[in-house]
Structure formats: C-alpha cells, structure tokens
C-alpha cells in the first residue's frame, strides 16, 4: 500500500473543508456496474478520511465498499469566481469499515459509530500550493 504524503498547505486545506464527494462502484447481481457519487461529511486525521452518515449502514456507498473497496474522493471549492480560482484534491484509495467513538457523527442528533475509512493511494491537487489561474491584469 502506498503512503500518500500531503503538503502542509494540502493538510491545512483538507482540515478547513467539511464536504467531500465519494465515488464507489460494485457489480450488481445482474452483472452491471453502476458508479455512485455522493456528497458526504468527513473527518481527516492526516492519514485516513472517515465518512459517516445517519443511515450509513443502509447506504449504497457502504454496501458498495463491502463488495469493492476501491474508491475515489474529491474535496474542492472555489476561492473566487471572478477571477476563476478553483482548488481541490482528488484521490484514489482503498476503503474499509471501522468503528470509532470520537468521529464527527458523535456531535449530531443521530450519533453513529460506523465509518467508511479511506486510505488515499494516489492524489492530485490544484490551486492549493499555488493559484491555478493567474490574473492577467
């Protein structure tokens, strides 16, 4: 397993964000594959991403991870619309299911201790260590 290293600015950015998009996929009984991407809340501890949810055990992402542990995750935003200045990090990784008592779902009206834990194995980032587009003014 590859140990992805994040720059200090990437870690600062990741810890400032609250929403990610996770993509999962699994083969259904009829042999078809339907990718699924959803916005999710997350925790990041510097090594792993933790994705929970009020009904995580019934979610498609949870069921997909049980069948196929390969996932993709994107965390992005816009620093500015004018000038256009996007930033973000895209990752491929492997996922498993863990129980943790101190995750972000503990603070919700419906605490849940089960999480999808994602170990990034490959990453791409843009606009974090330096601007994506520089102004021509």
Placement of each model-derived feature along the sequence:
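Extreme N-terminal tail/first-helix region
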Residues: 1-20, 137
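C-terminal edge-of-domain segments
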Residues: 99-137
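Short beta-strand segments
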Residues: 17-56
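A structural signal for short, well-ordered beta-strand segments
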Residues: 42, 93-95, 120
């Amino acid at each position: 397993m590859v140990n992805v290293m994040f720059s200090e600015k990437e870690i600062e950015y990741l810890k400032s964000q609250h929403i990610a998009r996770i993509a999962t996929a699994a083969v259904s009984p009829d042999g078809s594959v339907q990718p699924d991407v959803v916005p999710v809340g997350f925790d990041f501890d510097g090594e792993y991403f933790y994705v929970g949810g009020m009904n995580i055990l019934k979610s498609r992402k949870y069921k997909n991870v049980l069948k196929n542990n390969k996932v993709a995750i994107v965390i992005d935003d816009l620093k500015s619309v004018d000038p256009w200045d996007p930033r973000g990090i895209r990752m491929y990784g492997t996922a498993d299911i863990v129980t943790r008592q101190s995750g972000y779902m503990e603070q919700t009206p419906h605490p849940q201790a089960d999480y999808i834990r994602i170990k990034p194995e490959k990453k791409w980032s843009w606009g974090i260590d330096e601007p994506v587009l520089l102004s021509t003014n």
